[in-house]
Amino acid sequence: ESAGLMPHRRYWGQLDRATFAFGYGLMVTPLQLAHVYATIGGFGIARPLSITRIDPPVMGTRVMPESIVHSVEHMMESVALPGGGGTKAAVRDYRVAVKTGTAKKIGPDGKYIDKYVAYTAGVAPASRPQFALVVVMNDPSNGSYYGGAVSAPVFSQIMGDVLRLENVMPDGMPQGAENLIVMHDSHPQGPAL
């Protein structure tokens, strides 16, 4: 895995701070980005990265104040709501907290070219995050290239399928509607062999 690129804070100038604010000037892999979102979903507690469930859960280290993480997650949740830039990332009956993004690619001469990377990253369900997901689309070619248009629908489909397959209780339904849900036990007689 690539180490990514995040210059040390002591070397940040005004231009660095400005470009970091909209996602330029640093490089991370999708896995590293998913780890950051898992930390946000863990309310500021960083745990070792794992693709599969670790049982019992591993203790983590607090890396962000919980109050700040709740504020960030609340802002991210508004992205998938009507009026937000990532409404196509919404998952029916679930609250999701997402961030969409679009970056111009750099050509061999070091200048920006008319090719893009679109991404959508987030956690769900927003009320008690259990899953973090990052969808990256390299040089989308269907006419649109914004994260909110091309990667957000893929995020919605994957996250929705994961939440339903894992029998995660919906958190975006009106009060009392949970009685209308039929949950299926995926392992009625123990795990399948």
Regions found by a protein language model. Name each.
Residues 1-137, 147, 190-193:
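Beta-lactam-recognizing serine transpeptidase/beta-lactamase-like catalytic domain environment
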